[in-house]
Amino acid sequence: SLAEEGDGRYMGFVDVRSFIRKGNSSLWGEARYKNGKKTGRRWNETSDYLLLYPYVMGDTVGGDLKSEQYYFSGGYAYRKGSYTIGAEGSYGADIEYRNADPRPKNLTGDLYFTIGMSWKTGNHYALGYSLHARKYKQTNDLQFYNELGVPNIYHFTGLGTDYYRFRGAKGKSFYKGRSFGGSVNLSPFDAG
């Protein structure tokens, strides 16, 4: 495991899923809640490390983080003859924090949406395409309350380097991103 991701997690969670099919329509949804602790994180005070690497904020102290996560998703599909259309959306939010120095407060939001269509091309295959959109943001605020001094905060840029200009006690970062994409799929299906 990566030191930046920590050495363990203790999480309680609730996960509720539903699927309803009525006639040619299908409807599904999910709601999830997690609460717990991420242990032993070092050189990283930023949430979603694997998504944001190498542009993360870190320090030499690190430690355990309390985490609370929410996730909601849902979708709808409709089949008419050999054609199927559908849409799905999801939103995830996370807060990570620590009550001892260094004290990060990370708030994330991740919105994702997909639409797609497929049609049966013969007796054994379906051809489909889809479009995807994602919007992500994170507010990262790192504070110290120790009056005796604070360690340097590093704004890493990858390959062991950091923004020297921002090194010190400045512990605020804001991440914002968007992505768009698409896919084409050829899938076998049982014609029976």
Predicted segments — roles?
Residues W43-V56, S130-K176:
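Short, flexible helix-coil linker/hinge segments at the edges of structured domains or between repeats
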Residues V14-I20, F72-Y78, F113-W119, G182-P188:
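Residues on the lipid-exposed face of transmembrane beta-strands in outer-membrane beta-barrel proteins
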Residues L2-E4, V56-G62, Y97-R103, R167-K172:
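Extracellular loop and loop/strand-boundary signature of outer-membrane beta-barrel proteins
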Residues L2-G6, G40-T46, Y97-K105, N140-N146:
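Outer-membrane beta-barrel translocator domains and adjoining extracellular loop/strand segments
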Residues G8-V14, K66-F72, K105-F113, K176-G182:
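Residues that define the transmembrane beta-barrel architecture of outer-membrane proteins
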Residues F166-G192:
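Long, internal scaffold/assembly segments composed of regular secondary structure
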